[in-house]
Amino acid sequence: AGLDDVTGSDIGRADSGVEGTRTISLGKRELVVTAIANGPTGQDLMVRDAQTGTLFLGDLLPHRRLPFICADLLGWIAALERLSNEPAERIVPAHGPVALPWPGGSAPTQRYLTSVLEDAQVEIARGTPEAEAIQRIGANESGKWLFFNEIHPGNAARTLKALREE
C-alpha cells in the first residue's frame, strides 16, 4: 500500500459522546455503551454485546501490560468492583488476548491497583521519604507485568501525590 492508496481517506471523528448509557444498533446486533466516570482516564467506556455475552473493557482492564494510573485510583478500583457484577461470559481487555473469562480475568489488575493503594497508604503513615516509598510500593508485583520497571515508578509517585493531597 502506497500513498496513492490512502489519498483522500480520512479518520472518522466521533460525532457524539456518551453520558450514562447509549445503545448503538449495528443491524441485527445492538451494543450498549456505558460511560465509566472513574476509570483509568476518568472518561472510559464499557461496551456490552449481550448477544455474545462479551464486555469490551479496553484500558479499564489491561492484561499483562502494567496498568497506567493517571486518574482516580480509588475510583478505578471501585469501578472494577461494580463491573464485576455485570453479567458476561467473557471480557475483551486492553493489551492482552482476545478474551478472558469474567469476572476472574480482572483479578490481576484489581490485585495490582489494590497493592499500590494499600502500600502507598502504609508508606505515607510511616512517613517514608518519597524516593524510598516509590521503591517499596507495589514491589510484590514486580515480574508479573510487562513494562513494570518503566511504568510502575510513575504510578507509585502519582498515587503518593494523590493520597497526600486528600
For each feature predicted by the language model, list its residue ranges.
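C-terminal regulatory/interaction regions
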Residues: 125-166
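Short active-site segment of divalent metal-dependent hydrolases/proteases
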Residues: 43, 62, 98
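Active-site metal-binding loops of divalent metal-dependent hydrolases
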Residues: 38, 53, 59-60, 95-97
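Pocket-lining segment of extracytoplasmic ligand-binding domains
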Residues: 63, 73-80
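Divalent metal-coordination and catalytic microenvironments
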Residues: 18, 47, 59, 76, ...
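Metallo-beta-lactamase
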Residues: 1-36, 41-42, 50-51, 80, ...
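Surface-exposed cleft-lining segments at the edges of enzyme active sites
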Residues: 62-68
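Divalent-metal (often Zn2+) His-rich catalytic cores of metallo-beta-lactamase-fold enzymes
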Residues: 77-128
